[in-house]
Amino acid sequence: MAAKDVKFGDSARKRMVAGVNILADAVKVTLGPKGRNVVLEKSFGAPTVTKDGVSVAKEIELKDKFENMGAQMVKEVASQANETAGDGTTTATVLAQSIVNEGIKAVTAGMNPMDLKRGIDKGTAEAVKAIREMAKPCDDSRMIAQVGTISANGDETIGKIIADAMEKVGKEGVITVEEGRGLEDELDVVEGMQFDRGFLSPYFINNQDNMSAELEDPYILLVDKKISNIRELLPVLEAVAKAGKPLQIIAEDIEGEALATLVVNNMRGIVKVNAVKAPGFGDRRKEMLQDIAILTGGTVISEEVGLTLENTTLDDLGTAKRVNVTKENTTIIGGAGAEADISARVEQIRKQIEDSSSDYDKEKLQERVAKLAGGVAVIKVGAGSEVEMKEKKARVEDALHSTRAAVEEGIVAGGGVTLIRAIAALDKVDAINDEQKAGVNILRRAMEAPLRQIVFNAGGESSVVVAKVKEGEGSFGFNAATEQYGDMLEMGILDPAKVTRSSLQAAASVASLIITTEAMVADEPEDDKAGGGMPDMGGMGGMGGMGGMM
């Protein structure tokens, strides 16, 4: 085991704070509408230019192991804020830096770190309560666009496209961000339920213009097994042919004579039919088939529950206004399922999302909710170069997280104003000794830091602006983009309450850990014994002795 280097007390904290400051100083220059760019070196290709705090934080690794520990802990602040609300990473970093620096000063002056931590924790709880009370619901398209614009560093086109996407697919709909092919941003909206399975045979195509199979007002047969024997399907096919409607089959697989017979029937016009594989795999496939059944008002034919294809009637089939199948995707539009059943299914999946600990599972469950409840929108980001594309895509994703957070917990005045207003709530804190009071005061100063940094980045005088904002009430604040004072909500400078709240909570939680650190352990740096070159190999004797081995 390698030898360890151990540092205690002030010398440990000093090195740690140095690391905190290096990372925070690099991140905080990006804060606000006049935030500066940070250029990140890449191992190949052009460097990345970004104004996204979390991208900057991720890149930073320091040579000194003790300083690096401090930097990594502040990185954790950005990650926590990003995970909870998807934005507010730079604000959280600025808050954490201020709490750490003020807290370490107090500890060095001889105060008890644990009481300081208790004071900070009590203050945070009161401030969070105040932020929640200040929140206003965010339900109209204009507000959503403004939140998106602010989060995308003032890019109005991004705010507008996100607001359009949310309007079209609803609050529950899935919105994904992809790299586009042109210079302009585009929005594609898929109504109804779409899954990534295409037709099993090109002979099902009936619309040559867009190479798709379109069925109007079809019956939908859902089967949880492979179909290879056509005899099993005959009763259903005959019943559907009599009804004079098309049939969409969604099964685990359809092969051999079953598929061949369906193709022949379709081409001869006996029954208009199309077949696709069921989406997903294993248990997820069963769940998704059940989702489609509920959406279309049908039943999944599964031998596990005693249902067989031979005994299937028209009552077991689902229906929809239209089914559109391309080579890669199937879209079911206007499923005839009962609203109450769909709502109950959505609630059930939401419960699973709450109980799930895996991010991947949560994402897949959220997609299922969207497919049942709203629809899917794809924002295709346009840009002039790859460097710009990466930077813009990161901003669009940030803005999307922000708008979701705004819809969830409401909005508050942006530009650091809400934190300034929440300072008043710290007077309610029940601090039982001077050290806890000092902890509350550390938080009081830290909550001014984001506004100070926004003003500093805009080239203004921080102290003057903070004093003026404190004199005002409600959402009165400083618009750094225009350098004017006024009502932040009216000027459209909004932040999601969830982002402001989670920034403060993440910063206080990690900063408290740093303040209460008393010892640090790291690997001793290893000496390079070989001196950089290869050791002497004794000339290898000219290899002449190898002749006898032939």
Swiss-Prot record:
Pfam families: Cpn60_TCP1. Transmembrane segments: none annotated. It comes from the Bacteria. PROSITE patterns: CHAPERONINS_CPN60. ATP binds at residues 30-33, 51, 87-91, 415, 479-481, 495. Its main location: cytoplasm. It is found in: Cytoplasm. GO terms for biological process: protein refolding. Keywords: ATP-binding, Chaperone, Cytoplasm, Isomerase, Nucleotide-binding. It catalyses: ATP + H2O + a folded polypeptide = ADP + phosphate + an unfolded polypeptide. One of its GO terms (cellular component) is cytoplasm. Forms a cylinder of 14 subunits composed of two heptameric rings stacked back-to-back. Interacts with the co-chaperonin GroES. HAMAP family: CH60. Belongs to the chaperonin (HSP60) family. This is Chaperonin GroEL. The gene is groEL.
